Regions:
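Sec-dependent signal peptide recognition
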Residues: 2-7
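Hydrophobic h-region of N-terminal signal peptides that target proteins for export
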Residues: 8-17
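Phosphate-group recognition and catalysis centered on beta-loop-alpha active-site segments
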Residues: 16-342, 368, 375-378
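Compositionally biased, low-complexity flexible segments
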Residues: 334-389
């Protein structure tokens, strides 16, 4: 942890020395001007060397700023380029309001199911921030948020009705059909060009696609070769896909990531259930840096403001990673009492796949280091035999 704190400090200085964040489409005010769905697809098309995008889960959360609140979105956008994942629920009178849960218990100073209140009745309650502090903010409607974000930001719609416990089949179908109705020509969402849908399965994406939805992208989990092949056979063009990785850039999936990138598909990882859970802010930022160094294309987080000052540029991140690798190589050489020339051999050994490192029966596991003609990590320069630790 101490080593990563040192790297974090250096990374922050490096980030401050250049640009804060330079996404290709975001302007100086951090907004994204999108005039058509084609431009929206272009914004989410993978381009080598492009900066990592930080996504604000539920609009981003800070002290005094509740989740799924327009004021919270405004605050986050004032600090950095981003886009917003938002959730919504139906009221008793069929108004879509921003609300992650089916009840208002956790996020407001009220109690009860959203579906048991009319929109007007909900307006007497106030949203609370993550620490439980009551704010002055009311529950917004989805229509209000869409209008606020028009020509400004992108939105990721999360349809919680699809797999939420306690939701019946009739409610699920109603939510699916509501999406279709709103997105088809003439629907309330059809005039916007800044929406993609997080779907729980390829079948859900196909439900929208087969119903004629062509003005929204789909965020679908592709964490296995089987899921990759299933999407390839689906008939949905790759230009409509943002790939969600269940694990934060799993090395075992490198080949799949490369195939996705070859098709212009960005990979998003969510850290809301991992790094975001670290209580101490400094330690949390260390975990954020670890995630950045793994180079996903998009990171979804509850606390986007905590990424401010961290490097999101690929060149910056690779420079940090290279310096850390060099430091580790020097450390191994010093521990083994070997000349620094052995670093090249250590780097070569580190790049060999684990299966190729297995030693045939009866042979020595030690290998002569070309630069110094010694056994790397096994023999000190004074000739004494001692394994490097």
């Amino acid at each position: 942890m101490k080593r990563y704190l040192t790297i974090l400090a250096a990374a922050t200085m490096l980030s401050c020395g250049g640009r804060q964040a330079g996404y290709p489409v975001a302007g100086e005010d951090h907004t994204v001007k999108i005039a058509s769905f084609e431009e929206f697809q272009s914004y989410f098309r993978y381009v080598p060397g492009r900066d990592i995008i930080i996504s604000a889960h539920r609009g981003g959360m800070q002290e005094g700023y509740p989740e799924n609140c327009i004021a919270s979105c405004e605050k986050t956008l004032s600090m950095m380029p981003t886009f917003f994942e938002i959730d919504f629920s139906f009221t008793k009178d069929s108004v879509m309001v921003l609300m992650h849960d089916l009840t208002i218990d956790r996020t407001t100073n009220g109690k009860g199911r959203v579906a048991d209140y009319t929109y007007e009745e909900l307006q007497r309650f106030r949203l609370v921030d993550r620490d439980g502090n009551v704010t002055d903010y009311r529950i917004p409607t989805l229509a209000e948020v869409l209008e606020w974000g028009k020509d400004k930001v992108a939105f990721n719609f999360d349809n919680k009705y699809i797999n939420t416990k306690g939701v019946g089949e009739a409610e699920r179908r109603r939510a699916l059909d509501y999406y279709v109705e709103q997105l088809l020509p003439g629907g309330a969402w059809s005039e916007y060009h800044n929406i993609f849908l997080s779907v729980r399965s390829l079948d859900e994406a196909l439900y929208y696609w087969n119903a004629g939805v062509r003005n929204a992208m789909f965020c679908i989990e592709i964490s296995t070769p089987e899921q990759f092949r299933a999407f390839e056979r689906s008939g949905i063009p790759w230009s409509y896909l943002i790939a969600a990785s269940r694990k934060a850039m799993d090395p075992a999936m490198t080949e799949i990531y490369e195939k996705l990138h070859d098709r212009g598909v960005m990979v998003i990882v969510s850290i809301t259930g991992s790094a975001d859970r670290v209580k101490d802010r400094r330690d949390r930022r260390v975990e954020y840096l670890r995630t950045l160094l793994s180079e996903p294309d998009i990171i979804e987080t509850d606390y986007p403001a905590d990424f401010v000052g961290l490097p999101v540029g690929r060149e910056e991140l690779r420079a940090i990673r290279d310096r850390e690798a060099e430091r580790m190589e020097r450390s191994v050489c010093r521990a083994a009492g070997l000349p620094i020339a052995c670093r090249a051999e250590i780097r070569r050994a580190a790049s060999v796949r684990p299966e190729s490192r297995r030693t045939p029966a009866g042979s020595s596991p030690r290998r002569e280091c070309t630069p110094c003609r010694r056994r790397c990590g096994c023999v000190r320069s004074n000739g004494s035999s001692k394994a490097a630790r």
